[in-house]
């Protein structure tokens, strides 16, 4: 650990008995809206191209997920940080921007982040291999949190290679099972990178703090075609058909835990699990209730431990960030998976990790002026 980092008084891999007994107060997530990324990673306020999961008929199985050319590599994701989420907030500012007694426009959320941030925190108690880094900015009483890759992953590391293969299989599976409003999304000569990525925006109250976050989502194809019906979110994952008694606990603590955490955060009640053989052929896809997934793993991990660690870590981060009120200052929080420790350092003012853009700060300033001139706008924003 670098000497300029300070270690938090929190340990992911050890917890008190109460952390396994009392589940914290977390309200059911609310779906607030959605947006899409363009093929080049830019925000598009698009609510029409919803991706639906449709299981192919039995005659289509087995489905081959094998690569035809070069082996897959870890997907390099664009460094968009929170850009698209902030643009969504700006496009729906009447829902999220308000003016308090200090006559400054601010968000009606204590935390803005991606679902990945919350997933990493909840999985940390059982993560022993892969560390991560988060960037945190606090501005006008809201913390903005996103994942920041301080170090590049080792391309020849076996865990990274395994993750790259799993991501490739999942992208390939989606070309067979994901449809855009009833129309197949991907042609065989196109990759998933050439299409929109659909994200939902969610919120919940976490021990009295409102958390606003986005996540990539898939929808359940409705049984009827009634207009205006609420979307029902699902998930699509892959697991081996056959695993040994030693393989199952490892799978449950890693892959299955991540599936459950994502479903919990988004309020997903069921997911589709594709079962593949050793030759990367999917033989069937089963719909599984999320509560049944948890019951099958209850000896390997505790959802109460996961949720409580997320609460503790967010509280620690809040205490560190309490004196900060600057859109450019970023604090880096690093999780050491081998030790189960979290450390941090602050980078004051504009720096290489600054991710809250000037346009967002200017947008809040503009709303401050507009709302002070028009009291009705202030009232409407405060009650949303």
UniProtKB/Swiss-Prot annotation:
The lineage of its organism: Eukaryota, Metazoa, Ecdysozoa, Arthropoda, Hexapoda. Its main location: cytoplasm. InterPro entries: RAI1, RAI1-like_fam. It is found in: Cytoplasm; Nucleus; Chromosome. The keyword Nucleus applies. Involved in the piRNA pathway in germline tissues. Part of the Rhino-Deadlock-Cutoff (RDC) complex that stimulates piRNA biogenesis from chromatin regions corresponding to dual-strand, but not single-stranded, piRNA clusters. Promotes transcription of long piRNA precursors by preventing termination at canonical poly(A) sites. As part of the RDC complex, is recruited to chromatin enriched in histone modification H3K9me3 and might contribute to complex interaction by binding nascent transcript nucleic acid chains. Associates with chromatin upon exposure to homologous piRNA. Component of the Rhino-Deadlock-Cutoff (RDC) complex, composed of rhi/rhino, del/deadlock and cuff/cutoff. Interacts with rhi/rhino; this interaction is indirect and is mediated by del/deadlock. Interacts with del/deadlock (via C-terminal); this interaction is direct. Interacts with Rat1. GO terms for molecular function: piRNA cluster binding. Belongs to the DXO/Dom3Z family. It holds the Pfam family RAI1. It comes from Drosophila melanogaster (Fruit fly). This is Protein cutoff. GO terms for cellular component: chromosome; cytoplasm; cytosol; nucleus; perinuclear region of cytoplasm; Rhino-Deadlock-Cutoff Complex. PANTHER family: DECAPPING AND EXORIBONUCLEASE PROTEIN, DOM-3 RELATED. Keywords: Chromosome, Cytoplasm, Nucleus. Disruption phenotype: Females exhibit severely reduced fecundity. Defects in germline cyst development and result in ventralized eggs as a result of reduced Grk expression. Increase in the transcript levels of two retrotransposable elements, Het-A and Tart. RNAi-mediated knockdown in germline cells leads to decresed production of dual-strand cluster derived piRNAs. Transmembrane segments: none annotated. GO terms for biological process: dorsal/ventral pattern formation; germarium-derived female germ-line cyst formation; NAD-cap decapping; nuclear-transcribed mRNA catabolic process; oocyte karyosome formation; oogenesis; ovarian fusome organization; P granule organization.
């Amino acid at each position: 650990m670098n000497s300029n980092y300070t270690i938090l008084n929190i340990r992911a891999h050890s917890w008190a008995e109460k952390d396994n007994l009392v589940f914290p107060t977390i309200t059911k997530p609310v779906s607030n809206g959605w947006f899409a990324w363009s093929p080049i990673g830019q925000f598009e306020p698009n609510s029409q191209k919803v991706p639906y999961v449709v299981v192919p008929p039995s005659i289509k199985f087995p489905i081959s997920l094998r690569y035809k050319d070069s082996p897959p590599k870890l997907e390099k994701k664009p460094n968009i940080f929170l850009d698209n989420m902030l643009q969504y907030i700006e496009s729906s500012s009447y829902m999220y921007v308000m003016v308090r007694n200090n006559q400054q426009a601010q968000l009606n959320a204590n935390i803005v982040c991606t679902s990945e941030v919350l997933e990493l925190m909840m999985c940390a108690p059982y993560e022993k291999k892969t560390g991560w880094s988060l960037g945190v900015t606090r501005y006008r009483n809201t913390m903005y949190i996103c994942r920041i890759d301080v170090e590049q992953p080792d391309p020849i590391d076996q865990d990274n290679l395994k993750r790259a293969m799993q991501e490739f299989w999942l992208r390939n599976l989606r070309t067979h099972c994901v449809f855009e409003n009833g129309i197949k999304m991907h042609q065989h000569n196109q990759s998933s990178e050439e299409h929109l990525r659909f994200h939902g925006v969610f919120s919940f109250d976490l021990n009295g703090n409102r958390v606003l976050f986005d996540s990539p989502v898939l929808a359940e194809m409705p049984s009827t075609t009634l207009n205006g019906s609420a979307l029902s979110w699902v998930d699509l994952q892959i697991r081996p058909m056959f695993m040994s008694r030693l393989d199952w606990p490892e799978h449950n603590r890693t892959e299955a835990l991540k599936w459950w955490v994502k479903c919990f955060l988004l309020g997903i009640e069921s997911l589709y699990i594709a079962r593949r053989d050793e030759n990367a052929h999917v033989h069937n896809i089963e719909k599984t209730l999320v509560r049944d997934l948890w019951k099958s793993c209850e000896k390997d991990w505790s959802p109460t431990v996961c949720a409580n660690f997320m609460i503790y870590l967010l509280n620690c981060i809040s205490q560190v960030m309490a004196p900060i009120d600057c859109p450019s200052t970023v604090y880096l929080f690093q999780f050491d998976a081998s030790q189960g420790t979290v450390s941090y350092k602050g980078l004051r003012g504009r720096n290489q990790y600054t991710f809250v853009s000037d346009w967002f700060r200017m947008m809040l300033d503009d709303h401050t002026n507009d709302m002070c001139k028009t009291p009705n706008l202030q009232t409407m924003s405060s009650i949303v």
